[in-house]
Every structure is written in structure tokens, then in C-alpha cells.
Amino acid sequence: MNKVVIAGGTGFIGMSLAQHLSERGFHPVIIGRNKPKDLTKYEFIQWDAVNPGDWVHALENAHAIINLTGKTVDCIKTPENCDLILRSRVESTRNIGKALKEVSNPPKVWVQMSTAHIFGDPPTILCTESSSTGYGLAPFVGKAWEEALLQSLPSGIREVRLRTSFVMGKNGGALVKLKR
């Protein structure tokens, strides 16, 4: 069985990804804090995102772990929300790293959500992997998130950083709000 574990998979990206993977013969396992009422199609395991627990067994013999966890950035940037945006990403990433060290047959690849805004918003510069990071909340969070990945990554597991920007789709993401 080609099991793929999606941490933080109850949002727009996670559910779209689960459907895509399922259509291609993979078995998505969604890990999240709260099970959506309409989530009946995929296996769901509850976690608190900061402590290893019963969910760790899902990583055993999985093909991949995909970490999409984190408080939505679509909120008013109060000090409390900014802190939650940072901590929800960094703590969950560290937690996954701890859990991967507990299983006998961990996934071969860890796909880690990040942000294209790690470089800031340079208006005329084409950014590459060697570009300087920017300043502000998004670059700060992006750097901390990726550093947590690098510090938590067990040897032998390939890492992929998925640096997204605005996510849009017919039924979710930023497009729904932009249509209003």
C-alpha cells in the first residue's frame, strides 16, 4: 500500500491533495486537530501537533509525510495571531521530526510546506535558492519553519520544501474571497 500521511490535511490544500493522491492509487491518511464533519472518504487520526502520540504509528511504512500544518495567515495580524502563525508551524515540524525517529520504517520523503514569501516581496528580482531572505513576518516565519525542518530531519529521509504563495482553486483558497 502506498500510504501518504498528510499532517494538517483538513484544509483546502490538504483535502485537494488527498483527493489527487487517492485518484492515483495512494492511501491518504489525514492527521489534524479536529476532524471535519464531512471527512468520511479518508482515514483521519487526531493529534495535538506538539506531542508524539497514538498518531505516530501512521508514519510506519508510509511512502511520504507531507506537513501542511499551521494557523492560517488569512487573519488580522495581532501579536497573538503572529505568535500562533509561527509556533503552529515550528512546533508541529519539530513534533513530526521526533515522531519519525520513533518508527522502524519511516517515510522515504518529507514534503514540508513553506512560503514563497521567505524572500520578501522584491518587485524586480527573480528569486532562486541562493537569494537572500527578506524582512518581516513572512520571511521570519519561513526561515524559522525551514530551520525547524532541517534540525528535525532524520538522516536518510529526503526533504522537499514546498514554497507556496497565494493558493487558489475553484472551491477554496484565496480565489473564493477574491470573487466576493
Model-derived features with residue positions:
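N-terminal Rossmann NAD(P)H-binding glycine-rich loop of SDR-like oxidoreductase domains
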Residues: V4-R24
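Rossmann-fold NAD(P)-dependent oxidoreductase module
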Residues: S16, H20, A99, A148
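Short-chain dehydrogenase/reductase
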Residues: D83-V90, I125-C127, S131-E146, M168, ...
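Conserved Rossmann-fold NAD(P)-dependent oxidoreductase catalytic core, especially the SDR/UDP-sugar
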Residues: R94-G136
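Conserved beta-loop-beta element that borders a ligand/cofactor-binding pocket
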Residues: T115, E147-K170
